[in-house]
């Protein structure tokens, strides 16, 4: 059954391999949770604060983050399938070694975000602030940064395979 949590004060969460499914979190503050290796399926986070969360190695399927704060979150080594980030603040978030399929980033503030060694398939960036974002050793083929701010973006060498097929 679906669970809805609205503006619920949550205690510090420290659990590994936690399963969350068919849930909506609205206006919740998660005080720097540690949920490494957890699984999220059919979950919506709306106006939630997940700043400084450690969600490394997590799996996200059909998850929406709407107007959330993920500042400084460790999201490395995650698997992201059919996920939407809409108008989120994600400065200094770390997505290193992530695998992304069918993911959309829209209208987000993503300054200094790390996307090192990521794999992208059907990923879209729309109206994002990617100032100083890092994409080293990440193939950017098929991506479009046409309507996003990419000042100071860091990638591999200008002649490297990483830039082939990128639209700016």
Give residue spans per PLM region.
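Tandem repeat scaffolds
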Residues: 1-168
């Amino acid at each position: 059954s679906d669970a809805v949590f609205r503006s619920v004060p949550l205690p510090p969460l420290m659990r590994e391999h936690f399963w969350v499914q068919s849930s909506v979190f609205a206006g919740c503050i998660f005080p720097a949770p540690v949920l490494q290796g957890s699984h999220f399926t059919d979950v919506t986070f709306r106006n939630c604060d997940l700043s400084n969360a450690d969600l490394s190695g997590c799996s996200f399927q059909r998850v929406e983050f709407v107007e959330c704060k993920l500042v400084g979150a460790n999201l490395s080594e995650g698997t992201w399938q059919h996920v939407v980030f809409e108008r989120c603040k994600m400065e200094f978030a770390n997505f290193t070694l992530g695998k992304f399929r069918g993911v959309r980033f829209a209208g987000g503030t993503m300054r200094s975000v790390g996307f090192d060694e990521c794999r992208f398939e059907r990923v879209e960036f729309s109206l994002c602030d990617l100032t100083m974002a890092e994409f080293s050793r990440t193939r950017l083929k098929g991506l479009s940064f046409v309507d996003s701010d990419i000042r100071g973006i860091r990638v591999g060498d200008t002649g490297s395979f990483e830039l082939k097929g990128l639209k700016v």
